[in-house]
Amino acid sequence: MTTVRLTVRASPERYQLPEPVDFEQGTMTDLAQKRILLLVHGFANPEDKAQGSYKKFADGLTAVNESFPDAWGAVCEFHWPGDDRRGALASTVTYSFRVESAHASAIRLASFLHEEPGLTPDLDLYIVAHSLGCRLTLEVLREIAKKKDYKGPVVREVALMAAAVPVWDCLSPDGFKPDKTRQEHVLYSRRDMVLHYTFGIGQGIFGERHSAVGLKGRPDKRWDTRTSTGLRHGEYWGNNKVARRASRILGIGPVELPEHYPPQVEFDIAEPPRFRNMAGRLVSWRK
């Protein structure tokens, strides 16, 4: 099955403002499957780096279930100008412009999902995003919610990895609101030095001093599941444990136990093995 590549990146000779969504690879026929997995990269990712990250993630899912994606649905890469073409340092210095670019890209993507005739409400959309791409994703969901006559695919599951999103934006009445029609999952890490240090500096430009969602997984009650990964900021896309966690979100992971069995324990994948073994013995004793 062809991987679809959507882009809002401008041509090199133009200023890096997001353009209308365009098919860089694949067609609407490839995209309009019953289930669509949309991948959204983060901050300071040139297109080739994003493609490499997406491939690692897709390969990880295939390693969990070899029938993915052929028997599951479509895989769609989304590319947006989250970087400055002059390099990583320029991207960091112009962080405020990257945030604005994420917002503008979200508007473009939400319009595409709403207006594209081949994308209809009988299709299910799953989104996995990383870093500043998580903010872009939440912006997309907010834009969709504004459209009372939204005609696009239904968002079923959202997984936010190392989310570069202020916690306050997920608490404020004017921020990103949850929706009972979808599940929202957070994968976070207290060891993420990018979110611990760099994110705070970047947000200070906007007068915001709140910590990032992807650092501690807060606000706790907002998310349907929270998974501590113990990973560094750039380690998510190619991590096997993250792939297994995502596979369960997509419904291609290990089969769940029948209801009459005790519930499975969802261990923190960053926990030391000795704590996992101790918890496992406790569960066995209770049986």
Q: Residue locations for each model-derived region?
A:
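Lipolytic serine-hydrolase domain surface
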Residues: 1-32, 43-58, 62-124, 142-157, ...
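The conserved beta1-alpha1 loop
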Residues: 38-41, 130
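Gly/Ala-rich beta-loop-alpha elbow adjacent to hydrolase catalytic centers
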Residues: 109, 128-133, 137
